[in-house]
Amino acid sequence: MSYNYVVTAQKPTAVNGCVTGHFTSAEDLNLLIAKNTRLEIYVVTAEGLRPVKEVGMYGKIAVMELFRPKGESKDLLFILTAKYNACILEYKQSGESIDIITRAHGNVQDRIGRPSETGIIGIIDPECRMIGLRLYDGLFKVIPLDRDNKELKAFNIRLEELHVIDVKFLYGCQAPTICFVYQDPQGRHVKTYEVSLREKEFNKGPWKQENVEAEASMVIAVPEPFGGAIIIGQESITYHNGDKYLAIAPPIIKQSTIVCHNRVDPNGSRYLLGDMEGRLFMLLLEKEEQMDGTVTLKDLRVELLGETSIAECLTYLDNGVVFVGSRLGDSQLVKLNVDSNEQGSYVVAMETFTNLGPIVDMCVVDLERQGQGQLVTCSGAFKEGSLRIIRNGIGIHEHASIDLPGIKGLWPLRSDPNRETDDTLVLSFVGQTRVLMLNGEEVEETELMGFVDDQQTFFCGNVAHQQLIQITSASVRLVSQEPKALVSEWKEPQGKNISVASCNSSQVVVAVGRALYYLQIHPQELRQISHTEMEHEVACLDITPLGDSNGMSPLCAIGLWTDISARIAKLPSFELLHKEMLGGEIIPRSILMTTFESSHYLLCALGDGALFYFGLNIETGLLSDRKKVTLGTQPTVLRTFRSLSTTNVFACSDRPTVIYSSNHKLVFSNVNLKEVNYMCPLNSDGYPDSLALANNSTLTIGTIDEIQKLHIRTVPLYESPRKICYQEVSQCFGVLSSRIEVQDTSGGTTALRPSASTQALSSSVSSSKLFSSSTAPHETSFGEEVEVHNLLIIDQHTFEVLHAHQFLQNEYALSLVSCKLGKDPNTYFIVGTAMVYPEEAEPKQGRIVVFQYSDGKLQTVAEKEVKGAVYSMVEFNGKLLASINSTVRLYEWTTEKELRTECNHYNNIMALYLKTKGDFILVGDLMRSVLLLAYKPMEGNFEEIARDFNPNWMSAVEILDDDNFLGAENAFNLFVCQKDSAATTDEERQHLQEVGLFHLGEFVNVFCHGSLVMQNLGETSTPTQGSVLFGTVNGMIGLVTSLSESWYNLLLDMQNRLNKVIKSVGKIEHSFWRSFHTERKTEPATGFIDGDLIESFLDISRPKMQEVVANLQYDDGSGMKREATADDLIKVVEELTRIH
């Protein structure tokens, strides 16, 4: 068996739907947003959108509508999922707790029926008498809205019109009436029917209109006084109500297709329309009052307001503010202005909501060589196309920065005895010291009486008896706070320079070469208590008081040169309590005693970025549990700071890290800064609970995030990215992208807008010897859209487009790899293409082009003609493996720099995906699931090892390990196949067994090995192996990792218990939601643990936790089973949350 854990690292971000109404209360205006399986509820306030609650549905939200039945004080929410679970939800708030109550629920799936091509449509009668659903061709399903019905019961009415494009309920009709656009062999027509609840059938409707525009696609029901319906087409907009017919064909709407609409005014006089190019229009209905006082429609008018993100849905909120929900780009809150700006636009973006979808491709890279992966995704499409750089870490929010190079240390001070907060920052430089006064948010340089400024400071701070201390290379200086004056000074008896110092509020230890001196701080006096000689020179010191020692430390931690040791000595006698040899050549640079979660530790950082940490017994001074991690590559400086009343340690280096403890394990979290040399906590009036951070050139003051989270940076391309790969030698990314151009009158094409490929620093164009341009069987006509494909070379630091290489006309770039081939020392970008013509069912020719990028130039090294589309390529043992239409082919790279075919494998329908491990090749097919090949180097050919005989339409594949293979298919499921090497017969061995099945509810475009968290840092007892990330169409990033059998069984038990305790919204069974489901079959999930459900354990109340753990058997690592406590499970789950 194969045991896996699937969890969300980034929830879906693409918006599939949005509605507005009064859901949380009659007074609140709410915006409800559907992001695939997640429902987000906001209140619209004067300040913007305020999040109220986020609900995870056990299903993909297909329909979401607010309605208010008679007798209700606020709106109810109707939701239908893709697996046909329907529910009516109500918002209930009591005190702090918010509940979403399921008023009624049921499944409305038919056992037979062909799901409609135009998807699921759900509509609600304006009088709230019924809900109408168009799920299958030829059927209209009705759910009567009875007040007290807990179960949603539905019945079907036969529809003669099989191919319905869109349907709506009309306003102001005695009986519920539907109006719909349908297609038949003659064209498209509009028809209406009355729905009779009693007879459960249709009656003849009030009007119909035959032969409307051939592209008519949307019905908008218009409220009274007008009534009737508006039909939106590709070129025309028409209004019908039986006795009135109005048509307009504004040229402005022809360029693109209108895809969404929303009513602005309750009386239906204005509508917003959004098209596929991201343009926003206003449709105005002009009225005319008749003699008898009735109102009729006089005219329709369309105005272009401006440009937004490409809208999937629109909803008008209030005061000219519109929410634009987007699937292809970031969603927006926009303001509609009365007057246009210089560009002629009436639209201004107020706020942007990040969307990673659709993630078409991605790669994991460690750009800063920080041992932590960053994910770079190809996100968005058309003008919304972008690269997104995603990394996990603790964010620092910068509030001020000052250019100050060469800082060697910094300390906060309270210069005034009556202050609670810091008002001064002391900065140390080589040979000098500077003092900054903090006045509110203002920072100015000043001088402190009693301080010296012509020496480097080693320590500075507030100490006992309302005094300040400054330790410089020459002396230890004690200064009274009021008035500021030097009251005591200690110098080394021979006047030698101090090399290292440590100080707390009442004690000082300084090192002069090998000698150590211990001083105590008294009123107006520094008193030398003792001194000693060490065997070697002292490299670092610490006397941080631990435990309840009243601010006095009985211990001194010392790091020495030469023998590379860490020692614990007793104060005041300097008696050696423990000596720890650290080994190696690199000296300790920073040593620190600290307490995390009431356990004491000694941390010791070396000059190469390594960190040792030990348990410390403060009674005996003994060290235990030695562990080592690597935090960077440069000397590391350790400083403590407090955040959320817990102690944290900040490790300053080229890879700044925050160290804290969780469940008595140390956790190391990346900080999202390039490098930090020194830091100190700062709590001033203008900068409360902040940190001051110094690097080589700058001093920064900022606040720190409480938790790790994903940080996303956007690099807009304004065109569609398709594939990405990273090339370390040239420090570049290769990106395949495509832009849309339009055929102009001269026969050439022009770009619609400036984008990455048209604005690169340099560019080149393919000229192929292989294809003469006249072979194109297809002539484009004026106004036709053409895709132009490019290879972009993008700098890994600045993300600037350094070069754009344009491919041939009609040539689509499909695959990309960066690799070395054979014995050739060069690294190449290799692109696989296809010549795409509309009249060909599948491409008949393509190319493999080998590029080299060096010294800012892109050169074509070789090209190879192939008879088909190069869907996928990977480097394979120094050769190039490619899938071309149905063939898997291996090329070797000759000394003449040409690709030569070595062997082929033909047994596929369409080989779309390739992954390799050792000599094994996993092939993902369009419809024939996955196949495992082995390359036989001696014979120089492929051998078919095994295949999955289930017909899965693949969207991505990955190799988990030698025997387990992960697949994603087009019905939103994941599965794992296993190679059965131990099988007795050949026939069994040739079957890949499906051992894992799981319904993800997301369309996976890409899998890749890698992780978003620091690897192998600190102790981890997470029983997981490997980490495969995946990116989906909705912008979700997920992770699949493998479990041992015992852990799988524990988590499975926990999952089943959680399902009894956690009530799902809409009363949908978790087992139903996660069951593997295609048009062919439905099977229960197996071999996968739902990590999102397991992690929800941390969010439930303590009594509910107790309910989950009751009688749960747990092995705590001792080999013995015992009953688990809630805290045991909290530990387990917190460990699991750390993998993403």
Curated annotation (Swiss-Prot):
The record ties this protein, via Gene3D superfamilies, to: 1.10.150.910, YVTN repeat-like/Quinoprotein amine dehydrogenase
Pathway listed for it? Protein modification; protein ubiquitination
Q: At what positions is Phosphothreonine found?
A: 1125
Q: Which stretches of sequence are listed as region WD repeat beta-propeller A? A: 13-356
Region of interest (WD repeat beta-propeller B), residue spans: 391-708
The record's Gene Ontology cellular component field reads: Cul4-RING E3 ubiquitin ligase complex; Cul4A-RING E3 ubiquitin ligase complex; Cul4B-RING E3 ubiquitin ligase complex; cytoplasm; nucleoplasm; nucleus; site of double-strand break
Give the keywords, sorted: Acetylation, Biological rhythms, Cytoplasm, DNA damage, DNA repair, DNA-binding, Isopeptide bond, Nucleus, Phosphoprotein, Repeat, Ubl conjugation, Ubl conjugation pathway
The places in or outside the cell where this protein is found are: Cytoplasm; Nucleus
Query: Glycyl lysine isopeptide (Lys-Gly) (interchain with G-Cter in SUMO2) cross-link located where?
Result: 1121
Any keyword Isomerase? no
At what positions is N6-acetyllysine found?
1067
- Source domain of life is Eukaryota
Which parts of this chain are annotated as the region Interaction with CDT1?
Answer: 2-768
Q: Provide a Gene Ontology MF annotation, just one.
A: DNA binding
Whether DNA damage counts among this entry's keywords is: yes
> Which residues are annotated as modified residue N-acetylserine in the UniProt record?
2
Q: Which InterPro entries match?
A: Beta-prop_RSE1/DDB1/CPSF1_1st, Cleavage/polyA-sp_fac_asu_C, Quinoprotein_ADH-like_sf, RSE1/DDB1/CFT1/CPSF1, WD40/YVTN_repeat-like_dom_sf
Q: Where are the transmembrane segments?
A: none
| Disulfide bonds listed in the record | none
Q: Relate the protein's function as given in its record.
A: Protein, which is both involved in DNA repair and protein ubiquitination, as part of the UV-DDB complex and DCX (DDB1-CUL4-X-box) complexes, respectively. Core component of the UV-DDB complex (UV-damaged DNA-binding protein complex), a complex that recognizes UV-induced DNA damage and recruit proteins of the nucleotide excision repair pathway (the NER pathway) to initiate DNA repair. The UV-DDB complex preferentially binds to cyclobutane pyrimidine dimers (CPD), 6-4 photoproducts (6-4 PP), apurinic sites and short mismatches.
Self-association state and partner proteins as the record states: Component of the UV-DDB complex which includes DDB1 and DDB2; the heterodimer dimerizes to give rise to a heterotetramer when bound to damaged DNA. The UV-DDB complex interacts with monoubiquitinated histone H2A and binds to XPC via the DDB2 subunit. Component of numerous DCX (DDB1-CUL4-X-box) E3 ubiquitin-protein ligase complexes which consist of a core of DDB1, CUL4A or CUL4B and RBX1. DDB1 may recruit specific substrate targeting subunits to the DCX complex.
Indicate what this protein is called per its UniProt record. DNA damage-binding protein 1
